[in-house]
């Protein structure tokens, strides 16, 4: 078929607007035929005859005349067995003779495949260059030096020795170099190589071929070809330089030229053009003389550092006289038997006298290449000898290549068994990987299968590495996970080149911008692979005081097993639980600050925070922010008690709990740590910083849960049969009741709630506690156990009140003794015996030498140890407990923890380095004056039986009142505002006043002991941060949080005002006396009395650490109204407004009996502060 130039009008529509008339003229063809047959004279005669102008210049006439070739007759090279052609004129009669059936040459060294481009960029370069621009030659050299995959050159004339040196350098780096030269000017390139003494036949990564211009065929069969005027340099199929610049000295110095540097999609056209030209190319065949000279170069010995040193008649060095790299262009002798020329090893003759020639030896053979280099490995194994060493001189050559890696500045190049790692290949792989990400030239690429072949086949020659700065490789080593630490590299432990997949392809190993454990595996340790805390060598958990991983904290015992993330539990039960959690966080934030006892629903276990703020991955467990109904508490090991000689001695057991370990901090009252904020999605909205004002108080937060446990245990203690102290216990049934109670107040019945996760979780942790009693425990984990037990006891008491109220709807009253007896009988055998062996020993309150009867089967009861200034909490053990009891009297035959005298520790002793200050001794150090709180309804241990008169005088309320009151009971038990003070008077104190030993019974005391004050001085700030904790963990909108923050700040101002302190209460003889008959208000209902009994501990010691209740009900109402006005219709949970309005409407009737439910709800929340004020006035 005719070419486009021979039928220029084909397919054109003459009526089209852009129609271009054909330019072909017949006399052009006839004139050229005349020129080919008769010469220039015949050409001139034909033009004169036709009357046409001359269309060929003298140079063109000379070119046609010089390169005209006669047709190739068949008789000259007759094929074997073919007949002779009788037509001897050779004329084809056509313009398109027979197509060639020869095979197309392949890009045998490989060719990158482009998959996409990122934009297009064109840069124009001129020669001579402007002052602020690089020259075209310098840019070409820079491009060749940056080549990693291929260098393709199409040039009409290549005689620049500097560019030849750059090309050979690239070939020495195993970068394929393809050079297509004009067929007519290729001899000049051979002459240049001859002058530089370069044997082109021995350069493995260099392919030089020739391309001719299009062939023009005449009528008689004669033909001539043109020149190749295409000039471009293609590097890695990513960047192209094209223009009028030729690789000649004259173009650098005297000619003006223009060149463009293309990046992006424009490169694809050059890529295609080069492959087309290469398919039409012919091999470069030097002349016979040139071949003879090249062979002489190959056999001539290399003598000297200069290229022409030792050559007779030559005294000046050539442009390649580089001292170290002269042999690049002048190969050494061939008698070494090398498979490829030694010029590929630039350092072969450099410091050769100081180099070992033996190959490195390693277990399993000479080399252990990666799976991606299997073709090379098979070839090396074929060449290896029986002993696994590479045979012949080639083995020494490879060994020297590997050894020279030790000279390079790779910090872990030679770690392991010798210099086996080939970081030259690693750098090559890394550069290719980064190029595939588009870091340098903004393109993506992968290797063609032939490219894989040469990359794998020659991967083990380290000296073919680029001489450029190793910026890409440094980026790889610095940030990518492909190259791990040197410690992770062991022989046979896995591939050393992670970027290379098993099939040799580049495997992308993308690492996110934040490669921390929580980003890859989520914020919950249960979904992360391999918790370190469960392993024997696992690092201990960090906390807020450990800013860096190097600040390790000793933790005696394994970390708890990770639990499933509660937020991911699907189903309506999980959704309802999360909803109740959000409501609880809202209420705890709204009303815990100032309106803690305004009748609003209380925070649902908002204080149940973990002491260890950060999980093994540097974040808090997601379940810590949830109420216990949605947590599955993990089992924590305990401290096993050891026998000791006495109670007050300095036994070795005391040193165990005081080992430096996890510093206890309040979870959110201290400065927020970014690691904490990353712990979960729900904690990411912590926007308040109101807790900063309580930094000093937050330091004492470590023993808060101990105080809570003391208070709860003391309340639930009562007299059992035989005169022994029987203590109530929590159980899984209590957990079920708690879950029913935890439901919103819209379920007044509350008696048939569905069993939720709480029952299962509490049963699990109870069983785990029983199993781990004897295990050597971690003191850091015991605080969490106390917290869960506290929740159990508190919930059990609340639900027992509810059940008693429903079983006895017509009862006139519920005395404190009746309630406590019921609690003690209901679940006395269900508690795990964890705390019997957990921390301390119980103390008999009557004498120093009278041992306390060991009672119960593992109740979580807490008694203060008062043996000679040892203000430590005690856990008395019941009869039948699987663990030894705890008796701390001198001469006590029972085993127990031996507390040091004056040891300022609570039941959970503070660790060294803990931010919690030590608690001063009870009798050896002065204590700030504490109000005696006669009316605080504090339950203290006394030798006398309580007077039940005031509790029995109240009128009986209707059943509905009791039901609704029980739903609000938790609010009264642990409101936010009061929990800040619960630890102040919460420790039941066995008196050491010399009272006769008698069966101990809980009674309504007029005040707290001094020990309770001193014990709780350090732990007291734990509960003080409850409101801020709930605010921080709330899941509300930002506008509501801003309102709550203001109210919280206002509440802190109130807390900063110290309460009046009537006088010191050191060893007051009134501490153990029961209250008078009229202590309780006569108009209190049964529910209020029960609530007051249960809350007695939390309402005491108001002056401790400058904590007081809000000033008055009017102040709280004012704050609530202020909050409502600030919302401006931005209600988050409108259902809670009902409670606020109820309290506003019913606040005046605090001293009256229960008349209606709305009024009753209001009274429940406001009785206790008024009663407290009454008691204070009586004091």
Swiss-Prot record:
GO terms for molecular function: keratin filament binding; protein kinase binding. The modification Phosphoserine is found at residues 513-514, 516, 523, 647, 667, 759, 785, 813, 870, 881, 892, 903, 914, 925, 936, 945, 1003, 1009, 1024-1025, 1048, 1068, 1147. Residues 1-286 are annotated as: Mediates interaction with CSNK1A1 and is required for FAM83H activity in keratin cytoskeleton organization. CDD domains: PLDc_FAM83H_N. Changing residue 274 to A: Decreased interaction with CSNK1A1 and loss of function in keratin cytoskeleton organization. Keywords: Amelogenesis imperfecta, Biomineralization, Cytoplasm, Cytoskeleton, Disease variant, Phosphoprotein. Expressed in the tooth follicle. One of its GO terms (biological process) is intermediate filament cytoskeleton organization. The modification Phosphothreonine is found at residues 465, 756, 883, 894, 1040. May play a major role in the structural organization and calcification of developing enamel. May play a role in keratin cytoskeleton disassembly by recruiting CSNK1A1 to keratin filaments. Thereby, it may regulate epithelial cell migration. PANTHER family: PROTEIN FAM83A-RELATED. All members of the FAM83 family of proteins share a conserved N-terminal DUF1669 (domain of unknown function 1669) domain of about 300 amino acids. This domain mediates the interaction with casein kinase 1 (CK1) isoforms. Therefore, it has been proposed to rename DUF1669 the polypeptide anchor of CK1 domain. Directly interacts (via DUF1669) with casein kinase isoforms CSNK1A1, CSNK1A1L, CSNK1D and CSNK1E. Interaction with CSNK1A1 recruits CSNK1A1 to keratin filaments. Interacts with KRT18 and probably other keratins. This is Protein FAM83H. It comes from Homo sapiens. The gene is FAM83H.
